[in-house]
Amino acid sequence: MLYSFVKVKTMNYQRALTLTLLALSGVVLSFLPSCSSCSKGTGSADSTALDSANLTLAWDSIVIDDTYYDNPETKRGPSVYVNIAYLYPKGDSALIHLFNRFTFGDSFAQLSPQEAVARYIKEVETEYIYSPDSTEGYTPEDLDKMRSHLELRNKIHYVDSLVISVEKMLSTYFMGAVHGMYGSSISNVDRKAHSVISEGDLFVDGYAADLSKILQRYALSSYGRKTQQELEEKEGIYVSDIAPNDNFTIDEKGLTYYYNLYEIAPYAVGQVKIFVPHEALVGILRPNSLLYHYLPETNQ
């Protein structure tokens, strides 16, 4: 019965897989609790703090942990388990709109966090719970086993007076799939401009080729390998595929690039992270690039 289900549901799985990949490549699994006062980011991956009195950020969160059914009255039939932990800034509507956009998509930007979460759950139900006309021919027990899941969380990697670096983590499984999908989407906010920071804001025109070489070089050091061949053979990472993807965190030490499943390595390798110190990027920085603020004076 499972095999026939997989065949029937191939198109639905492909759609869900596409949605997952698009969500991760769009404008983003530990959850950070809300905080009302913060200290300056120290560069740790879990930093949520800011110490400056006039730049203090207050945080709030919405947590959803529930299962949604095709038949909510009886709680029977196809279902989707949804776990959402949404951390967002309080008291700054522009930042809230950016966080909504990062986490849920462009069309959610102008909603309140509560409205955004509620609408997102409705969309998840539509995409991950099978409609009745697609479940004909199955017993009630078969339908009860048609379970999908979606977990969505965001995390603050680093905060200071210049930037907020946010990671969105999405994990999905669509019933009938061989395996689930997971990955991260990073967004960086220019705190003064209330705008999203892209590679084009940081680096000179035509930066891609030089940045690719830098990333490939630091991939070796990140994984403790001496040659590209060794990295490919021992780690399964295709060095020639490593290129800028606008998916990076910023902190006071450097940039960490994230590559999701299948980007530069097979599924089994998992997510790949490459750290590049700010000093290695001096040659391709745009004049007045925000990253100059993190360089020692001798390199500026």
Where are these regions (language model features)?
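Compositionally biased intrinsically disordered regions enriched in Thr/Gly
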Residues: 36-300
